């Protein structure tokens, strides 16, 4: 009987550690993504404030700042909309033409995948074939 209790305790510890690891993954990923966007914007703001930079380069820098800000807003909106569909947590990463969605927990159902694709295509103007959905449990 002691062995059973020890095994149960060990299983509970493993479940707790997995949950913490998954929670940390989403927290750290969100922090890294926000830091990356902030650094990109800061780099473009440096270009804008540099007196040795041409007006054409400044225009491109301003367009990039706007694009990054719009992308950040679209990601935030999409993540929040997807959470209203019952997904506990998720991360959206946009890389050139592809959108990677990492969903917390079990593999999403066909219905959840369709809802995620619908929201991503609408909010991020992505094509369905460019949306890649995975889970992290």
Language model regions located:
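N-terminal, intrinsically disordered, polar/charged segments of Gram-positive cell-envelope systems
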Residues: 1-52
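Soluble non-cytosolic domains of exported or imported proteins
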Residues: 31-38, 55, 68-73, 107-111
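Envelope-exposed proteins and targeting segments
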Residues: 40, 44, 78, 86-90, ...
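Mature extracytoplasmic domains of secretory-pathway proteins
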Residues: 56-80, 84-85
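Surface-exposed aromatic
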Residues: 58-66, 91-106
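Short, non-transmembrane amphipathic alpha-helical segments
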Residues: 78-81, 86, 111-128
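A short amphipathic beta-strand at an alpha->beta junction
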Residues: 125-137
């Amino acid at each position: 009987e002691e062995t059973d209790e020890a095994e149960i305790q060990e299983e509970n510890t493993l479940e707790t550690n997995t949950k913490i690891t998954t929670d940390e993954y989403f927290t750290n990923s969100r922090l890294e993504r926000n830091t990356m966007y902030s650094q990109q914007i800061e780099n473009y703001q440096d270009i804008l404030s540099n007196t040795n930079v041409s007006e054409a380069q400044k225009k491109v820098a301003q367009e990039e700042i706007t694009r990054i800000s719009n992308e950040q807003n679209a990601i935030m909106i999409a993540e929040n909309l997807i959470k209203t569909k019952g997904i506990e947590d998720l991360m959206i990463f946009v890389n050139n033409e592809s959108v990677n969605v990492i969903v917390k927990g079990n593999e999403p159902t066909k219905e959840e995948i369709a809802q995620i694709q619908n929201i991503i295509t609408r909010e991020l103007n992505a094509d369905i074939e460019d949306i890649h959905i995975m889970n992290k449990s």
